[in-house]
Swiss-Prot record:
Superkingdom as given in the UniProt entry: Eukaryota
Name of the protein: Mitochondrial uncoupling protein 1
Keywords: Membrane, Mitochondrion, Mitochondrion inner membrane, Repeat, Stress response, Transmembrane, Transmembrane helix, Transport
Homology family: Belongs to the mitochondrial carrier (TC 2.A.29) family.
Compartments, as annotated in UniProt: Mitochondrion inner membrane
Organism: Arabidopsis thaliana (Mouse-ear cress)
Pfam families attached to this UniProt entry: Mito_carr
Taxonomic path: Eukaryota, Viridiplantae, Streptophyta, Embryophyta, Tracheophyta
Disruption phenotype: Slight reduction of shoot mass.
Gene Ontology BP terms: amino acid transmembrane transport; photorespiration; photosynthesis
TM helices/strands, residue ranges: 15-35, 71-91, 118-138, 177-197, 218-238, 269-289
More about this protein: Over-expression of Arabidopsis UCP1 in tobacco plants increases tolerance to oxidative stress caused by exogenous hydrogen peroxide, or by drought and salt.
Length: 306
């Protein structure tokens, strides 16, 4: 991120660095994302029901999945997850600087206002997920497969089979199921992540003794993850439930109301800890990788010029 200046890398190079960094973050943290999705899709026990919830907490959920389904199940959905990050990560992160510069004007000098950073994050998050929604849908569907009883036939044999099966059985439009809450979620979370990283990094660099190094990137990444989860959890829960149980809800508002009535307001923060564990670590890994990837590309460009 460049807090106030113009990007010193071309758009294709920025896109490539962003997509690569997002994919690294995805591979490293998808077990936590799988745990988050399972917790969000788990319905609260009915009043008087003695059945205890199957999944309890981040580590408990990860352990249960690994024990009952094998370690590989923790990476279920990694293929569409990487598809998603190549498209969505590359677009939302790669376009952030150009869009931010567009909003402030080419002749702007100084620190970019926080409002412009937020607006740029909302814009690139919304545009990016409109393209990448099918990959998000398939990822959630594959992660939700573990809800099926032991021995029950699986709907999909893999990512490509999931795409074709959904199109064949539900139509092409089904690939954009949950687009409304997904656009809202990703626009909000993207703005929270990128704007907060930008702002926190800019603030830290003004403190004597701090430089643009790994420590600054880690602190900024943790701040980005925290703000993203606090702001985006409710719409994230709605998105996961709509994509995981597509026939149970008529739309975004219907899903919100039914969730509120059946599970109460705290249901919108179900999985908060694993969500923060995932997004906090994802942001640290992604931004560290992004900063190093950009540094490497700059050095490579400089060596070619010399």
């Amino acid at each position: 991120m460049v807090a106030a200046g113009k990007s010193d890398l071309s758009l294709p190079k920025t896109f490539a660095c962003s997509a690569f960094a997002a994919c690294v973050g995805e591979v490293c943290t998808i077990p936590l994302d799988t745990a988050k999705v399972r917790l969000q899709l788990q319905k609260s026990a009915l009043a008087g029901d003695v059945t205890l919830p199957k999944y309890r907490g981040l580590l408990g959920t990860v352990g249960t999945i690994a024990r009952e389904e094998g370690l590989r199940s923790l990476w279920k959905g990694v293929v569409p997850g990487l598809h998603r990050q190549c498209l969505f990560g590359g677009l939302r992160i790669g376009m952030y600087e150009p869009v931010k510069n567009l909003y402030v004007g080419k002749d702007f000098v100084g620190d970019v206002p926080l409002s412009k950073k937020i607006l740029a994050g909302l814009t690139t998050g919304a545009l990016g997920i409109m393209v990448a929604n099918p990959t998000d849908l398939v990822k959630v569907r594959l992660q939700a497969e573990g809800k099926l009883a032991a021995g029950a036939p699986r709907r999909y044999s893999g990512a490509l089979n999931a795409y074709s099966t959904i199109v064949r059985q539900e139509g092409v439009r089904a690939l954009w199921t949950g687009l409304g809450p997904n656009v809202a979620r990703n626009a909000i979370i993207n703005a929270a992540e990128l704007a907060s990283y930008d702002q926190v990094k800019e603030t830290i660099l003004k403190i004597p003794g701090f430089t643009d190094n790994v420590v600054t990137h880690i602190l900024s990444g943790l701040g980005a993850g925290f703000f993203a989860v606090c702001i985006g959890s409710p719409v994230d829960v709605v998105k996961s439930r709509m994509m995981g149980d597509s026939g149970a809800y008529k739309g975004t508002i219907d899903c919100f109301v039914k969730t509120l009535k059946s599970d109460g307001p705290m249901a919108f923060y179900k999985g908060f800890i694993p969500n923060f564990g995932r997004l906090g670590s994802w942001n640290v890994i992604m931004f560290l990788t992004l900063e190093q990837a950009k540094k490497y590309v700059r050095e490579l460009d400089a060596s070619k010029r010399n």
